[in-house]
Design a protein with these regions (language model features):
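Class I SAM-dependent methyltransferase Rossmann-like catalytic core
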Residues: 6-45
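Conserved class I S-adenosyl-L-methionine
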Residues: 50-59, 158-201
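Class I SAM-dependent methyltransferase SAM/SAH-binding core
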Residues: 62-115
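A short acidic, Gly/Pro-enriched loop at the edge of an enzyme's catalytic core
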Residues: 116-126
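A short glycine-rich, Lys/Arg-flanked "PGG" loop and its adjoining helix->strand segment in the class I
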Residues: 141-153
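Short alpha-helix
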Residues: 229-246
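Core SAM-dependent methyltransferase catalytic element
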Residues: 245-247, 266-288
Length: 288
């Protein structure tokens, strides 16, 4: 079947699409902003149309779709522990009027800690968008070493994390609780009460395509459990884990928020942790 689809696409080209149809803000953010950032960081060191990519933590695959449609990517394999990517054909129809997904995209469900290098595939580039804060801390070293093994010599891994745990909204719960550093100031029980009692509409850019699967109350519980499972990784720790896995840092950018730090936190945590909201990290596997 895949061979037939490839032949069809070769003969007739990609299915038509129209970005002016986009109505969902989550889709827009990942189709436009996230893809633009990946292209900015990865496109400067790799030729996107001729490179083979792995997306570690691909989610719903929207960013991958954009990289194909807007930046000419021809081979992206997305992996994730969830199966949100199965919704991509429907999402693409609704948001772009697109009748079929490009054959450049393939997806796979994995389990946490699966050794991807065993498949024997070598990639020119790997990307990971807001995923590594969700990786179990005791698996970080193993997973980064595995991703290193998945890259060809001279290949690149791009990692983005936002928000980092100790930053003002590092709980990933801002859609329900806009109090800066509340996760560091309140007990887990008090924090859950705030989430549980929340009423009203959410920021559309924070409502992903999995929301309907859970319902209002179920989604609250889902994101709160995700919060409890965060690995509390700092930017310095991420860089150290990556270096220990064999990567060299090709480029790095850390973004900070300009906010007054509560006195009660200033003595507990380094100021850099508390204000460092985001990291962009481009890593290289040295050539043989």
């Amino acid at each position: 079947m895949n061979r037939i689809l490839r032949l069809r696409e070769r003969l007739f080209g990609l299915a038509s699409w129209d970005a002016s149809r986009i109505s969902d803000e989550w889709f827009r953010a990942h189709f436009e902003y996230a893809a633009d950032v990946v292209n900015h960081w990865v496109g400067g060191v790799l030729d996107i149309p001729s490179s083979r990519f792995l997306n570690f933590g691909c989610g719903d695959g929207i960013t991958d779709l954009s990289l194909v449609l807007r930046y000419g990517a021809t081979s992206i394999h997305g992996v994730d522990v969830r199966q949100e990517y199965r919704k991509l054909p429907r999402i693409a129809r609704e948001q772009l009027g697109m009748q079929r997904i490009p054959v450049a995209l393939t997806f796979q469900t994995i389990k946490s800690g699966d050794a991807l290098a065993r498949a024997g595939r070598q990639y020119d580039g790997i990307m990971s968008w807001s995923t590594f804060e969700h990786v179990r801390r005791d698996q970080l070293a193993t997973i980064l070493a595995d991703l290193h093994a998945c890259l060809r010599p001279g290949g690149y891994l791009f990692i983005q994390i936002e928000p980092l745990f100790f930053s003002p909204y590092g709980s990933h719960l801002r859609r329900y609780d806009d109090t800066p550093w509340h996760h560091l100031l309140a007990s887990e029980e008090d924090l859950w009460r705030v989430i549980e009692s929340h009423e009203g509409a959410l920021d559309p850019a924070e409502v992903d395509f999995g929301f309907a699967d859970f319902g209002v109350d179920g989604y609250k519980r889902f994101v709160f459990n995700e919060y409890k499972a965060l690995n509390r990784l700092t930017a310095d720790e991420l860089v150290e884990f990556a270096k220990n896995a064999g990567f060299s840092v090709a480029r790095e950018e850390r973004r900070f928020l300009d906010m007054p730090v509560p006195d009660s936190l200033a003595g507990q945590y380094p100021k850099e942790w508390l204000l460092n909201n985001e990291i962009f990290l481009l890593l290289r596997k040295n050539a043989v």
